[in-house]
Amino acid sequence: MKTINLFKSILAIVAIALTTIIIGCSPEKPENERDKKLHEDPIRAVFTLQEGTLDNVTTFDKQPKKANFKASSVPAQVIEWQTTAGEGWHRTSQIEAFNVKNCIDNPNVVYLLKMEYYNAKGEMMNSQFYNLGQDKIHQHFFSTYKRVQYKGQTSSVRVTNKADLPYDYRYIDELNGAFIGETNPMGFDGLIKFVKPGRHFELSVDLLHAAESKF
């Protein structure tokens, strides 16, 4: 597997810095990789965060859908990364991280987080992760880590207690107009809110290619 750390920064309000980890596919026989994985490798990643509201503030804790979200007049924030042979993955957008509002001080605010991936031809390739059964083995996962001391050394440990997480996320993916966020979560479209005032943190976004079906 190949992991690429894309975003690392500090923000002002509640702050989120995305550490995006794109995990490439590694079949047992590398020479057959192109034949087996059924999708191209992305060379460009575009993450868009749009502030907005839901039709009802309680919808987030139920099962929100795209239709429940209404974008605000605040311009979307976009972070873009590309990979080249000489540099590997590097940020190409001026924005390094997202400035966000917490939902304690702003209870109606929620954000739409969209992930878009592009191939070497400049074509958006999100559909390749859905077609030919690829939806069964691909999914975004969201994590944050904390520093701990262990045997005199500092290590990073994933936060597993939901009460300690500074964010809350809901999958709202659709396929051919039908909602699949609950039965087949993908994470190309999701709603996220920030639940800890005055925090800045790094959010690890993992695009997983699994060896077996998630069902």
Predicted feature descriptions by range:
Residues 2-3, 19-47:
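Bacterial Sec-dependent N-terminal signal peptides
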Residues 34-215:
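First exposed extracellular module after export/assembly in secreted or surface-exposed proteins
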Residues 2-12:
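Bacterial N-terminal signal peptides that target proteins for export
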Residues 7, 28, 89-90:
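Short, intrinsically disordered low-complexity segments
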